[in-house]
Structures are given as C-alpha cells and as structure tokens.
Amino acid sequence: MDYPTLLLALLHVYRALCEEVLWHTSVPFAENMSLECVYPSVGILTQVEWFKIGTEKDSIAIFSPTHGMVIRKPYAERVYFLNSTMASNNMTLFFRNASEDDVGYYSCSLYTYPQGTWQKVIQVVQSDGFEAAVPPNSHIVSEPGKNITLTCQPQMTWPVQEVRWEKIQPHQIDLLTYCDLVHGRNFTSKFPRQIVSNCSHGSWSFIVVPDVTASDSGLYRCHLQASAGENETFVMRLTVAEGQTDNQYTRFVTGGTVLLLLFVISITTIIVIFLNRRRRRERSDLYTESWDTQKAPKNYRSPISASQPTNQSMDDTREDIYVNYPTFSRRPKTRV
C-alpha cells in the first residue's frame, strides 16, 4: 500500500471515530435492556436487520417473514426477539447479560413495501437515569386536548448553527427534531408522535405538541449551538392532567384575588371602626350637653299661661321667684 492510500484510509477511520452519530433514541446501559424498534406506518414488512455501528457496521440479526430469523454468532446467546411482536412491525431487540462492550450505537433497518427503507439509530450510554440530571427551568400545566407550544430563546446574540429538541424520560431520551441551519439539513425524527417545529434562521426556536394527552407529560429540552462552540440549553416540564391549567396563570390570578380581597377587607374594617368611633363621640357630646342644660339655675319666673283656669289654686302655680337686688353695706352707724 502506497503512502497516499494509507493516509486516506487513516483519514477515513479518524472521521468515522470522531464524527458524531445522530441518534433517534438514547437509553441507559443495563445488563437486561431493550432497544425499541417499532415501524409506525402500515406496510408489508419484507426484511429487518440490526447492526452495531462502529468503525464499520456489525450485523447482529436479520429477519425475513419468508426465511425466518438469523442471529449472528457473537450475539446468539445475548440477544433475542419476542415472537408476539414480530408480526406487528415491532422488532425490539432484547439483551440479556450485556457487558460494557455493548455500549455504543445500534441501527434498526426495516424494509417495507411500498414505503421503502425505514431506519432508527439507538444510542446506549452509561447512565443511572436521565430525568434526575436535568432540573427544569420552567413548568407548564395543561388540560388534555390543547395544543402546547414550547419555546426557547437564547440570551446571547450569536448566530445559531444547530437546534435540537428532545423529550427526556427516566428510561430514555427521544430526539424530536434536529436542525442543521448551516447546511440546511433536517433530521427526520422517529418519535411515535406528531411534533410541529420550525427550522429556520433566527434567534429562537419552538415546537408544537398538538392535542396533548397524559402520555405527553415529561421533560422537554432545547439545545442551541453556535458555530464557534457557544451553546445554551433550556429544559421545560410539561404536565398534562384533567382539570389542570397553567400553574403560572393560576398562581397569578389566585394571588391577585387574595390581595384584592385583603385590600377590600382592610378598607371596610377601617371605615367601620371610624364610623363607630364617630357615633360614640356624637352620643357622648349629646349626653354631656343635655346634662349641663338640666343642671343650669333659672333666675326667671315662667309666666302663667292664659289657658290655665282662673280658679286654680295659687299653690299650684306658685314657683320660685328670683329677685336681683343690690347688696347693702352693713357697717355700724357712727355714734354722736
């Protein structure tokens, strides 16, 4: 092998090792794990093949409705399929006694008629769980049947190169949409749920989950990356339950109602206390004035009414008479 050929071969191996593999679903490694592969459309299944992706594709198993199932020797004792699922386009691969060597990327390729080839890539990673490692930035609560829009907008002003939306569950992460804005490529999702998204140049991104149900509850992550390596991540929790609404709006309305009620109660209490004190003061002043009027001495005689009978006893009409007279000095007379 000449030098240029060797260099090209090494370059090919390097690119294969370093190039990021776009996956549809990521699952944590376990000794007994399952790699889900369910074809969502209706079609005639002609062949299914599983591969492990490394520097090369390593065939694990192949299935044909005509020729049956063949599992390659390195995996014959460690993987299996459920017979009950093979007739319904469900070619989920099950592992038993898996080892750390089984960490990596796997590909499930289905050949159907008349749709053609359908492929799903699954990543197996070392992880204890996914939800605990990503605390949400916000929480959205909704009733079933609504269309929910999830939005993320970066704080920085750098141009966005890649946008990735994911749904995070304890047992797996599903890629909802991937946009390569530089090369104009959109990665087709294999998520078994219709998700509407925008893949256009801009400073923000959104997805729409139409007609939500309880199964749509969970964490949703938006990852934005720039060409220079800058990146931002937003995590939102969606809860779908009967009789629930957006908790932020509910808290706002409830808080405003409580504050308004407290304000009305305070104003009413102040007015009632003020009126009670005013009435007490008025009653006290009236009582004092009446009492002083009754105790005041009279220095006049009330005239006799002309309507009184003339033969009325003088004793009955007798009243106290007060006469003002000068005060005379009582000095003793001087004797001559």
Curated annotation (Swiss-Prot):
SUPFAM superfamilies: Immunoglobulin. Phosphorylated. Residues 19-126, 135-239 form the Ig-like C2-type domain. Residues 276-336 are cytoplasmic. Glycans are attached at residues 32, 83, 90, 97, 147, 186, 198, 231. GO terms for molecular function: cell adhesion molecule binding. Cell surface receptor that plays an important role in the immune system, particularly in intercellular adhesion, lymphocyte signaling, cytotoxicity and lymphokine secretion mediated by cytotoxic T-cells and NK cells. Functions as a costimulatory receptor upon recognition of target cells, such as virus-infected or tumor cells. Upon binding to its ligands PVR/CD155 or NECTIN2/CD112 on target cells, promotes the cytotoxic activity of NK cells and CTLs, enhancing their ability to kill these cells. Residues 19-254 are extracellular. The chain crosses the membrane at residues 255-275. Interacts with PVR and NECTIN2. Competes with PVRIG for NECTIN2-binding. Interacts with ITGAL; this interaction mediates CD226 localization to lipid rafts. The gene is CD226. It is found in: Cell membrane. This is CD226 antigen. It comes from Macaca mulatta (Rhesus macaque).
